[in-house]
Amino acid sequence: MQCYLKRKERSVAFITEKYAAIIQKPSVKDSDCIITFTCISLEEFEKIKEYELLFGGEKILGTLGLFNYVCEDMKEGVFLCVARKAKLVLRIGNRDPISKLENVSFISLDQELWDEELFEPMPRNSSPSSTFSTSTSDLNNIEKDNLVNSEYSSKYSSTTRIYPYHSLSQLTDLLTDGSFYVSTNISCFSRFQSEQPYGPKDIYCWNRFLITELDNHFSEAHILEKFPNLLLHCFRGYVERMFIDSMSMSIISKVSSYGSRQTYPPSGIDDSSYCSMFVETEFIVEIAQTVFSFVQVRGTVPCFWEEQFSSWYGPSISFLRSSQASQSLFNFHFSKLYKAYGDIYVIDLLQTKGFEASLYEAYKHHLMLLPFPAVVKKFHFTPDPARPDIDPRLETDLADDLKEMGYTQKSIENDMLESFQKGVFRINDLDCLGRTNVIQYQISRLVLKDIFFNLQIGVTFNILEYLRHLWSNNGDAIAKLITGVGSIGSSATRRGRKSIAGSLSDISKSFGRMYVGRYPDVESQNAILLLLGCFPNQSPVLISESVSSYIQGVLRQRRSEYRVERDFSIFSSTFNANGKVPSTDEFKRLLLPFGERTSAYDLYVVAVQEIITLNMSHLVSSSNQKLRIWEEKILMILNSRDSNNKYMLISSIQMAGVFLGVFIRKDDHLVVSKVTKTTRKTGFGGFSANKGAVAIEMNVCDSDFCFVSSHFAPKVNNISERNMEYTSISDNLVFPSGMKIYDHTNILWMGDFNYRIDSDNEEVRKLVELDDLDKLASYDQLCTEMKKGTVFHGLVEPQLTFLPTYKFDNGTNDYDTSDKQRVPSWTDRILATKSFTRNCYKSCDIRCSDHRPVFATFSLKIFSTCMDKKAGIIRDARIAYIKSKNSNK
């Protein structure tokens, strides 16, 4: 297959022996990114004279799909990804061959800036490329194609030329880093027992965002038979085959393209119940005209967590959602595994002490609450570092399970499936790399031993040596594509024993991972997200007059039919607790300020400052004891009132004395998604957590929210310092999603902002006695700064209807009577975007602190997508499209 470019009225053509496929972006502007796909005969194509042969005449392998991208000049462009070279690495039986991707080019359908390098062949020292046919004769043609490519290459000078920087060079680097493998058929991602009706194949397809529209169009328009090798699918992972005498051993590891994160540091699941670091590894033995296959999977603990690093405390586990809020998606994760593999045998390798202990306990708790018998056997196992080769404990523990699970066996001669694997081991440690790979190797060794026992063949030392190298290479490869460094423990697996050199290598790798964990590779993660189409402004390229483009048009026209609007109510409260915990009665007054007449709200957002006493011992301590007390008390009050309205904690966060918790009706917790949280220190120039902000972002249905709890600098004259702290938080508080506070639609910002009433103490106290709130507000520093536009841009505050909330003598209703005689002030405030309708804004008479808590209630409209209605519209549109096409024939 060869590739041609037409510069005028730009289009790209793929040429086979009989047909030409032409891809072009129309000049007519459209709201969607649409291209045309035309299939003509070779004779028709040869009549068109404007096309120029690309890549020095070298044959290409096919396309990985179409990509829509906004270039540096802010012009939106469509790029076609062409796979130019791949190295054949594995072919077994009648399975489609797997080749390692080595060279790709992105051809612009809009601009000619990068055209010159498209006319150059690959460097002369390129290794042979592969083809993707399944016949022996075509495999023999590989060498002929390589000779042709060499002839073309020799015609060109090898001198280096400088080309303009390509907008998609980061994707080129990613796709050719040695971890991507391609095939023409998605079935290469199936396990060997592909006849079994399970396994969602697309989770391993890394170019699904680029190729899905072409896949669908080829199927609907019956183009596939004309261009069987044009569309390529790629997965990321590691593939290797080793030959030993008359047998071979192979390993195919496929990294899932779904999950909360594909790079280091590790994390848990996403809102679709896919976990990060999920890898399916198939161990294949080919001997005596028979193929044996055994599959294992690895993946992080499937609840909402992430690993964090602190200069004070080192690594720690942060849970993004409460255990209760995580359980439903934890269950869904295991139900999908059960559907794909059958019985799930969980092997947990987490440490029971140290910072991993909290994650170990959470995993154990979630597994106990699984509502179905998907997990046949679950146990915790700690690998023995002195026995990297084989651990007798593991063999004893797994003997019955391996016998029950079995393995897949298939005859190459008659292509008959003789047995298949029943169930799968799901293995995890913190990052599912070093420890997990060692255990997977040990299990594969037990499987190999069983296979050879049934064949009545002895396992030789040579075979075990190859097996160790195979799994060590696999561990290193998977670890490198995720962390940039090899697998810890791989040298011990390779040698079958620990060594000084191996220990030093592991120490070096540990430091490498520590660095990557502390300073994540944002560029690599962004390149991955770009490839997968995960950024909010990314949309797939559609083909004109395809069913997909037709359906998108119908969905736009009928959007109001499946977009549902609903009323949503929020109760918010902020309280500087001065290190105190309110009594049960005070908690009731805080959350039910109108007693039994208080409405039940959909969402409760509680912000606390000085949840602990701000002394040095508390600031350097990582204890979350007070946080747990507040969470439990809040839930107790909310759930004791009405049996029909039960609440659960969605997420909470604490940074020293600053706390924020979000609670929602249990009936609504499944519509919450994209929950992340973050902090920003502002104390002592950003080094101390005694002042600063914590924030939680989340989606409720299709509406996004950002909740912030802040504590600013004290003292009446520190206005500029408070303004700077606001700027520091608004500019530098960044969520893991990359969003800042003002990137959200619905913002609720609460806290002890410490802005004071800037007037004489005696006058202020007299105005307080007269209840002259308007006059007091005219002296309020925050009102003044907001009018100037200095702080809280775009946020508004309800009218102040309550007396100043600071500073009181503890346990009394008297303003400060100490020698300092602080001026009464509204330090505690709640601000929101205009999307909120403000219903009530008051303070509570709770006297355990020198502040009074403030609460505000809001209502707003949120939107959700009715998936059943949307699916019905899509189904009707598809039927209408097919009828229209049939009537035009």
Swiss-Prot record:
| Swiss-Prot/TrEMBL induction comment | By stress.
Give the matching Gene3D superfamilies.
Answer: Endonuclease/exonuclease/phosphatase
Task: Tell me the keywords, alphabetical order.
Answer: Cytoplasm, Hydrolase, Lipid metabolism, Protein transport, Transport
Organism name? Schizosaccharomyces pombe (strain 972 / ATCC 24843) (Fission yeast)
Give the first-level EC class, as a single word. hydrolase
Functional description taken from the UniProt entry: Controls the cellular levels and subcellular distribution of phosphatidylinositol 3-phosphate and phosphatidylinositol 4,5-bisphosphate. Involved in distinct membrane trafficking and signal transduction pathways. Highly active against a range of soluble and lipid inositol phosphates. Active in dephosphorylating the 5-position of Ins(1,4,5)P3 and Ins(1,3,4,5)P4 and to a lesser extent Ins(1,4,5,6)P4.
Name of the protein described by the UniProt record: Inositol-1,4,5-trisphosphate 5-phosphatase 2
Q: Which GO terms describe its cellular component?
A: cytoplasm; membrane
**Family indicated by similarity:** Belongs to the synaptojanin family.
**SAC domain spans which residues?**
171-484
Provide the reaction this enzyme catalyses: a 1,2-diacyl-sn-glycero-3-phospho-(1D-myo-inositol-4,5-bisphosphate) + H2O = a 1,2-diacyl-sn-glycero-3-phospho-(1D-myo-inositol 4-phosphate) + phosphate
